[in-house]
């Protein structure tokens, strides 16, 4: 009986030990793979770091930055304006243009509640010069004009080192015109609530903070907005498009800047504008090809001066 009991106890404790052995075996296997797991995690971290480094290097490497509205910024896919300019010039181009924006500031009474305000040229130039896009990034979720490309375009623009940029193109004007923004203030030439004042202010700030940066103005393109007359006839409260264009040309002369005169020279007018745009203002694929090629060729001419 004692022998049987001893045998039973032996089997009992042997069986009790098996799970421990199994646990120890699993633990040993896990320990064995720790170096592999650690190496994998390290590789991912390094890869992510390299990717971020490449991204940041890419942001540093742009020769040309476009600042404008939907004429330059709306399309980010086929035959995009910046892509055509890049192909034409061989220069690296970053598209920092945002649809729906003006050169001038608006709504001075409630500027902190007007979330679209911070992407207008004069406000964006403040961010570029101060190297602080906090306001723009905070406003973006509530921006009623924002398109799908805004978040990435703004995030990447905030990483561009303008000390390494050769040229910036300032293209705004269509929305100042169609929105009836005041043309100019004779008593204050740097009044940012006017089209002319905002342009002068933006040019002055960029020149002061980035003295080696070449600034080129680009006049708005001809347009024919729905249910209105062509832009050389239609006045939305502050003048026809011709007046906004003439003022931009005048400001280029004031500052001794080169200007790419799309309005007068590209060949868009009331007889063909609907062939080159989706709606009388926003360029279609054919229009973007012509526009980007024209701007690129004129840019090369400006760089040779």
Segment roles from a protein language model:
Residues 1-95, 158, 163, 302-304:
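N-terminal secretory targeting modules
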Residues 63-67, 92-97, 166-172, 214-219, ...:
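Structural recognition of the beta-strand scaffold that forms the well-ordered cores
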Residues 73-185, 189:
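Conserved SGNH/GDSL esterase-like catalytic core that processes O-acyl groups on lipids
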Residues 111-112, 220-305:
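Catalytic His-Asp segment of secreted/periplasmic serine-dependent ester chemistry enzymes
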Residues 169-183, 203-242:
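Active-site segments of SGNH/GDSL-like serine hydrolases
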Residues 185-194, 235-236, 282:
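The substrate-binding groove and active-site-proximal loops of carbohydrate-active enzymes
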Residues 194-197, 201-205, 243-250:
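Alpha-helical scaffolding segments of alpha/beta enzyme cores, especially the outer helices
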């Amino acid at each position: 009986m004692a022998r049987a009991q001893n045998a039973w106890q032996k089997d009992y404790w042997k069986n009790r030990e098996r799970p421990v052995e199994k646990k120890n075996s699993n633990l040993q296997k896990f320990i064995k793979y720790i170096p592999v797991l650690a190496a994998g995690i390290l590789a991912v971290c390094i890869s992510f770091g390299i990717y971020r480094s490449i991204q940041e290097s890419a942001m540093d490497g742009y020769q040309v930055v476009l600042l404008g509205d939907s004429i330059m910024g709306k399309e980010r896919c086929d035959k995009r304006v910046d892509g055509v300019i890049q192909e034409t010039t061989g220069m690296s181009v970053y598209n920092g243009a945002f649809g729906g924006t003006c050169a001038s500031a608006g709504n001075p009474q409630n500027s902190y509640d007007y979330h679209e305000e911070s992407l207008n040229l004069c406000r964006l130039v403040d961010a570029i010069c101060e190297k602080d896009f906090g306001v723009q990034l905070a406003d973006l979720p509530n921006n009623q004009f924002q398109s799908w490309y805004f978040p990435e375009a703004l995030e990447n623009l905030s990483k561009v080192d303008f000390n390494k940029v050769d040229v910036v193109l300032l293209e705004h004007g269509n929305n100042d015109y169609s929105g009836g923004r005041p043309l100019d203030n004779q008593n204050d030439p740097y009044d940012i609530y006017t089209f002319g004042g905002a342009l002068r202010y933006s040019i002055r700030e960029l020149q002061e903070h980035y003295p080696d940066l070449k600034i080129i103005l680009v006049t708005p393109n001809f347009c024919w907005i729905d249910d209105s007359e062509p832009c050389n006839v239609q006045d939305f409260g502050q003048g026809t498009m011709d007046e906004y264009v003439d003022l931009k040309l005048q400001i280029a002369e004031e500052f001794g800047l080169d200007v790419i005169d799309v309005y007068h020279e590209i060949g868009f007018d009331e007889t063909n504008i609907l062939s080159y745009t989706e709606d009388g203002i926003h360029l279609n694929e054919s229009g973007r090809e012509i526009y980007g090629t024209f701007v690129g060729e004129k840019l090369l001419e400006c760089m040779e001066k």
